[in-house]
């Protein structure tokens, strides 16, 4: 098999594992009696992202070849995720989990081993491409795009797949036993992780590179990058990175339960949007893939600050459109627009922010600085934002039982509009403050790579 195809398959599986549950997990948690803890399940991903990728990076640098470590991480992540499935299976369809603490522990351990694999996948791809004299700038983006395709593929699969007394099947209609509502989403994720574990051991070896001289623990952990906070503009940038990061996981955690809650309203119970929340939100990932291609033009035309501002104000529309829409026409158009604008909201800050860090930092600490940027957005910011969003949602909404087509189902219902407009207002305030206080030095952008 062609080397680039093999790496593309690796990326496909890597993100397929995540796509199986990331946007629909909240629906099952409500049924399992953990509806008020949805925010914690997404915050856990941010918490482990603060330290686990760094620790596994050190192991990959010194002790275990990256492709093998990637496989081992997926073995453990998959095993713990299958454990989550087993607990749901034992509890039975539509029933609360008897041991919620154990379920949370298994999920946390799965995340702890999965989150480092995102960076490890990049390391493996870059290392193998370079060792085979291939151009990473030219050859990596198409490989990475297959990751987004994998994420979308499993979103569509769990959205449509179901198992009931009649057997296994697919449907776009109303069915309470679709994987997007049940513990089966964890089974899909766990099995894919185990498949990727086996696949990793078929990949070419990545040689360990011994670094000359002694490297301090601070350097190994990337702590040198914290010196950047001494510079006002960099300190402001990282603070705003955390504030923007507070928006990142909100819709991953609550868009699914929000859209599905319309099934509790008779006029929307059989609507496409209410019954296919995971498929509908996959438009966000499609938009994300397309917007990556637009970034070079916007950066060269408008500069880094304007592109970052576009991202911040895109979050205003992302949340605002959810607050305006409903599953019927023309309201569903606002849901679609919210998903389309997600690509700008997510990509424009992440990519332009990475370029800003690359331009402003000493080459010796660029890698650590990029790690700090990711920690502030996906770690600290996402964790605080998700927990705060959870408190807001729990204040205005609650899980209630409904009978839909003869099946007892649980939906998170309440004043969703206030929740979405609160999130939109936060993004608007952050955007205005960013426009006023962040004043980066204008530098020419000669080359843009992803």
Residue ranges: model-predicted function:
Residues 61-75, 300-312:
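Cytoplasmic membrane-interface "Motif A"-like loop-to-helix N-cap segments
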Residues 305-353:
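C-terminal transmembrane helical hairpin of 12-TM major facilitator-type secondary transporters
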Residues 1-50, 233-269, 276-280, 350:
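Helix-loop boundary and gating motifs at the non-cytosolic
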Residues 1, 203-239, 264-266:
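Juxtamembrane intracellular "pre-TM" segments in multi-pass secondary transporters
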Residues 40-61, 279-295:
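Central cavity-lining transmembrane alpha-helices of secondary-active solute carriers
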Residues 55, 84-89, 192-204, 379, ...:
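Multi-pass alpha-helical transporter architecture, strongest
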Residues 75-97, 313-329:
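C-terminal ends and interior cores of transmembrane alpha-helices
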Residues 160-191, 391-427:
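A membrane-interface helix-boundary motif in multi-pass transporters
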């Amino acid at each position: 098999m062609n080397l680039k195809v093999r790496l593309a398959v690796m990326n496909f599986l890597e993100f397929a594992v995540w796509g199986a549950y990331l946007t629909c997990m909240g629906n099952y948690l409500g049924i399992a009696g953990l509806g008020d803890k949805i925010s914690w399940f997404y915050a856990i991903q941010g918490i482990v992202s603060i330290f686990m990728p760094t620790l596994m990076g050190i192991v990959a640098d010194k002790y275990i070849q990256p492709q093998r470590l990637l496989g081992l991480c997926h073995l453990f992540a998959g095993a713990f995720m299958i454990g989550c499935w087993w607990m749901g299976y034992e509890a039975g369809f539509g029933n609360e989990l008897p041991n919620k603490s154990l379920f949370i522990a298994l999920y946390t351990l799965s995340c702890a081993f999965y989150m480092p694999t995102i960076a490890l996948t990049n390391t493996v791809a870059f290392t193998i491409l370079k060792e085979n004299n291939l151009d990473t700038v030219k050859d990596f983006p198409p490989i990475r795009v297959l990751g987004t395709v994998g994420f979308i593929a499993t979103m569509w699969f769990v959205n449509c797949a179901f198992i009931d007394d009649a057997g296994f099947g697919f449907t776009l209609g109303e069915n309470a036993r679709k994987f997007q509502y049940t513990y089966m989403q964890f089974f899909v994720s766990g099995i894919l992780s185990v498949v990727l574990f086996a696949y990793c051991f078929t990949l070419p070896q990545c040689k360990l590179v011994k670094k000359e001289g002694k490297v301090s623990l601070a350097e190994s952990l990337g702590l040198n990058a914290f010196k950047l906070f001494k510079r006002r503009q960099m300190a402001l940038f990282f603070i705003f990175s955390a504030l923007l990061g507070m928006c990142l996981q909100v819709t991953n955690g609550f868009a699914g339960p929000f859209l599905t809650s319309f099934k509790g309203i008779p006029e929307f119970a059989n609507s496409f949007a209410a019954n296919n929340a995971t498929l509908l939100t996959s438009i966000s990932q499609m938009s994300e893939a397309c917007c990556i291609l637009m970034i070079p033009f916007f950066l060269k035309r408008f500069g880094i600050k304007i592109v970052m501002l576009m991202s911040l104000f895109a979050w205003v529309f992302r949340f605002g459109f959810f607050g305006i829409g409903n599953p019927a026409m023309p309201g569903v158009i606002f849901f679609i627009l919210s998903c389309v604008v997600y690509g700008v909201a997510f990509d424009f800050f992440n990519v332009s922010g990475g370029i800003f860090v690359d331009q402003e930092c000493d080459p010796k600490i660029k890698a650590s600085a990029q790690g700090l940027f990711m920690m502030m957005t996906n770690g600290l910011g996402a964790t605080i934002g998700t927990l705060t969003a959870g408190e807001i949602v729990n204040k205005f909404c609650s899980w209630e039982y409904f009978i839909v087509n003869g099946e007892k189902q649980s939906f998170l219902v309440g004043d969703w509009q206030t929740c979405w407009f609160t999130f939109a207002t936060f993004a608007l305030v952050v955007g205005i403050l960013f426009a006023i206080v962040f004043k980066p030095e204008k530098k020419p952008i000669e080359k843009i790579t992803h």
